[in-house]
Amino acid sequence: MAIVELLVVLILSGASNAEISPKVGVNYGQLGDRLPSPSLSVHLIRTRLKASQVKIYDANPRILTAFINTSLLVSVMIPNQIIPNISLSQSFSNHWVKYNILPFCGNVLIRYLLVGNEVLTSPDTALWSHLVPSMRRVKRSLNRYKLFKIKVGTPSAMDVLQSSFPPSKGSFRKDIAEDVVKPMLKFLDRSKSFFFLDVYPYFPWAQLPDQISLQYALMEKTNVTYTDPGTGLEYRNLLDQMLDAVHFAVKNLGFPTLRILIAETGWPNGGDVDEIGANVRNAATYNRNFAKRFTRVPSVGTPAMPGAVIPAFVFSLFNENKKPGRGTERNFGILKSNGVSKYQVDLSGATLEYADVLPESKNREQYKGKAWCVVAKGIRDMAAIRNALSYACSAEETICGEIQPGRNCYRPDSLIWHASYALSSYWSRKRSVGG
């Protein structure tokens, strides 16, 4: 009987993987000045990057129009701010799908509809309770219009985990595990969707460059390995460790067969003076190795998910100079904001050797001086600065403790000083996790 059950599991597993094939796409963000037009961007995605799928952060009709009659698989997104509206109204959800998705479905290969972006990282905790109800409503709306091929999901960062090391001890944060994540996993499992994950080995490596090998983080061939004491599984790169930590967290909540999709990954091609290893050479190396590994047939999977097909999107198409935060946030692009390549990468995985000569790394050691994330000179939008200050302070109670009246770093009537302090504190903590 056990043999029969095993055969059934293997057959089902094969059928599941047959529905998807190893594909690496690219995230197409729009937070930059003078970016190429949507039509030119799509041309670059297809010819320069050779990507098979693309993910955008809204449902911009100008961009969706550029995807008409292409072979690109497309992922679109519902913005965080309208999640409560969808959660509370099926008619609102139906209307949104009818006017943002339905007009393009005959000519654009929309395959994923994502509800929000990193909602469970947001300091707006009231939003969390609206997430899963919104996902359910959106799925009903898609079914209403017979759009059965579109999977519903939501991207999560690595900070949804309470524990990620060793991988076998992966677990979700206690404030979200039972009330939000478990119902979400149940929905994703029943609808045969994915756990969408934003995962960046750069950030944990940059926090511990003396303890984590750079080659291990870049997926280079190396003798460095790590053996999980709980499972005996051997790891040869940091990304596999991070993916399996999420897999075990999902498994421990009762969903061992739920598939993972990498919604974002990448390596910064530049950054601030204290952001070690953020350079073109490392970015090219990581993304090239990633593309080769995640387009391989048969699929490699991970130590805990051998042979698993893991669809993925690299971040990002362009450098985006309007993104807030540390310098790395604006420098994940494979292309410059004008469309010129920062380096060559073939996301189809077909190119094994590259002709371009990569520049030598200049920031291979940790910066010894002091560095701050500050409000840029010349910024006059005080409302935007207040919003940034409020956002940073709301993320954790302790971030802005020292700039309260009577504390060491308080300066009366100095909004810019307080905002700079808060942003520095916020980003120094956020970059300690890999997503």
Question: What do these predicted ranges mean?
Answer:
Residues L40-R62, L73:
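Catalytic domains of carbohydrate-active enzymes, especially glycoside hydrolases
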Residues R136-R140, F148-G153, L161, I176-K430:
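Substrate-binding and catalytic surfaces of secreted/luminal carbohydrate-active proteins
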Residues G29-I45, Q90-P103, E178-K182, A384-A388:
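Short, acidic/polar
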Residues V24-Y28, S52-I56, V74-I78, R111-V115, ...:
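Hydrophobic faces of well-ordered beta-strands that scaffold small-molecule active sites
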